[in-house]
């Protein structure tokens, strides 16, 4: 077993001993927030981990990588990557009783950049994540209509037909791209602010502020609804979905394994990334949440329970989603067949009702044999149920196009629409609780704001500032900006932060010390599984994912999808390269959090060296006299 531990002078001065820990907890009882009960804590963690990605990204990955075959690498990496890192964050937060900045600077002053990087990522992800909630609210407000506004195309100005853009695409596409986003044809074409989205964005940030105004004291109450209601709605949709025609086609298609996909490196890469992102690791929110626990809370059991719930939710949500997609695909297949039947009837003046789906092929052969010239002039659509099922969709396309189209075909469609968008709202809001915690607590640890400022004021200023920056997502090009941040803000930075977290605990703090801490907190040492995954397996997996991701991204041109009614293959989205200036944005979004870690470490070492330049051992002395938050004592 690897026992390498890097030199870390002054650690004993920065970390309270186990004997002092319970005393500190009692002293903090009146000043530091704590959970009302264990259920609050678990629901908050589940709500933070289980988000929109479980509903609209995991099903897409299953469909793209061999259906049930994708479950194999997903579950393997969930055990070897997700659970160990989740346990580590829970345990280190509970042991040191601080937020992300306080935890890592306590372990070593040069590691304060890890906490700052987590804060940056939480800020940037929250910046666009709440915009998705604003879109959800817009659809929710429009759901109280019969018929639903996206169920049919609007008429043109002359009232002689449908609007051309809608007629060439579909009513759900038109409502999403034109009525909601009023999207431009380029990220460079910013356009103007869409006032209806701005109003919804205002509502979204107002609701979030009310729910987080006093930290866990208010979020702990909200999670009773936001973390449980999605499961109720998912169950209702599953029951309803199973009664719809073709639902089983979707479920069978989802879980039918294509074993050959297991030899595809991208399958394992996507599985590892999905496990990583679905746990909301490296944001700093989970560390803060666990710091409010009792010293002797069983963090090991918590990590296992949250992981099981997270994995189960992904599979459960995929089942629900594909029951609806199966219904949608069957409806489209039936429409396709009926269109072909109508084409044949009109082409040969056949009596209506004579040609059915069952005898269509027989009539085709008869018509072709009777009058091949007339038959050759007819154009038939290709109707294949698997083609409709395999049209992979993820993200906003699944929520605002595929699901909304399926809902329009259900009886009492406004009811199902209201339920669906309530579910998405709760999933998004509960995830934002963790993002806000990942920003507010580090700012308090950094002492940037005056200590006399109440948390309500700090939270309000953060919400207001982020809300103003988020105006960019209300422009005509807002969807393109959101996709850009979604692709780069929450990808590589989180991977690097998580790797640094595990390296810091195992090789800087010391895994043997960490084992003793956990034994003190839960009553027994971590078993061999935790030892192997923390020391070797999990860091190695993250390193491999990073290398694969880096190789893939470096070797391909940055592209994005645009909605252009003048595109020759419209209504397909057109893939175009990003403008050159976007590369600078990518460097800022993905590079700044990553560079914060080494830059702050170098700055800290240089500063300490300069302060002790006259002492041959100045660097060691400087580090050994660091305070708990990583700053030098006078």
Curated annotation (Swiss-Prot):
GO terms for molecular function: neutral L-amino acid transmembrane transporter activity; symporter activity. Glycans are attached at residues 158, 182, 258, 354, 368. Residues 63-65, 141-192, 243-268, 326-413, 478-490, 553-581 are extracellular. Disulfide bonds: none annotated. Keywords: Amino-acid transport, Glycoprotein, Membrane, Phosphoprotein, Symport, Transmembrane, Transmembrane helix, Transport. It is a multi-pass membrane protein. Induction: By high salt intake in SHR rats. Reduced level upon high salt intake in Wistar Kyoto rats. The keyword Metal-binding does not apply. GO terms for cellular component: apical plasma membrane; brush border membrane; plasma membrane. PROSITE patterns: NA_NEUROTRAN_SYMP_1 (PS00610), NA_NEUROTRAN_SYMP_3 (PS50267). GO terms for biological process: neutral amino acid transport; response to nutrient; sodium ion transmembrane transport. The modification Phosphoserine is found at residues 17, 627. It holds the Pfam family SNF. Residues 1-41, 87-119, 214-221, 290-304, 435-456, 512-531, 603-634 are cytoplasmic. Transporter that mediates resorption of neutral amino acids across the apical membrane of renal and intestinal epithelial cells. This uptake is sodium-dependent and chloride-independent. Requires CLTRN in kidney or ACE2 in intestine for cell surface expression and amino acid transporter activity. The keyword Kinase does not apply. InterPro entries: Na/ntran_symport, Neutral_aa_SLC6, SNS_sf. Interacts in a tissue-specific manner with ACE2 in small intestine and with CLTRN in the kidney. Interacts with CLTRN; this interaction is required for trafficking of SLC6A19 to the plasma membrane and for its catalytic activation in kidneys. Interacts with ACE2; this interaction is required for trafficking of SLC6A19 to the plasma membrane and for its catalytic activation in intestine. Interacts with ANPEP; the interaction positively regulates its amino acid transporter activity. Belongs to the sodium:neurotransmitter symporter (SNF) (TC 2.A.22) family. SLC6A19 subfamily. SUPFAM superfamilies: SNF-like. This is Sodium-dependent neutral amino acid transporter B(0)AT1. The chain crosses the membrane at residues 42-62, 66-86, 120-140, 193-213, 222-242, 269-289, 305-325, 414-434, 457-477, 491-511, 532-552, 582-602. It is found in: Membrane. It catalyses: L-alanine(in) + Na(+)(in) = L-alanine(out) + Na(+)(out); L-cysteine(in) + Na(+)(in) = L-cysteine(out) + Na(+)(out); L-glutamine(in) + Na(+)(in) = L-glutamine(out) + Na(+)(out); glycine(in) + Na(+)(in) = glycine(out) + Na(+)(out).
